[in-house]
């Protein structure tokens, strides 16, 4: 499973790959927000998770 995290405070998008497939939402949030994990702020992040989550980078086309 992959987790994509949009972190407004750091102005970045993170892609965490190869997380355990057995994780439930509680465990994902503990990893993202917990002191023993990434220790990110809930108020400045959004996340999504799944097997097919990826980041696609594109150039602006006028």
Regions found by a protein language model. Give the residues of each.
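N-terminal acidic leader/helix
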Residues: 1-31
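Short, mixed-charge low-complexity intrinsically disordered segments
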Residues: 29-62
């Amino acid at each position: 499973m992959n987790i994509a995290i949009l972190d407004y405070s750091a102005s970045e998008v993170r892609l965490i790959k190869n997380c355990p497939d057995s994780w439930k939402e509680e465990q994902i949030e503990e990893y993202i927000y917990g002191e023993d994990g990434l220790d990110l702020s809930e108020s400045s992040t959004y996340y999504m998770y799944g097997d097919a989550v990826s980041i696609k980078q594109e150039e602006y086309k006028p």
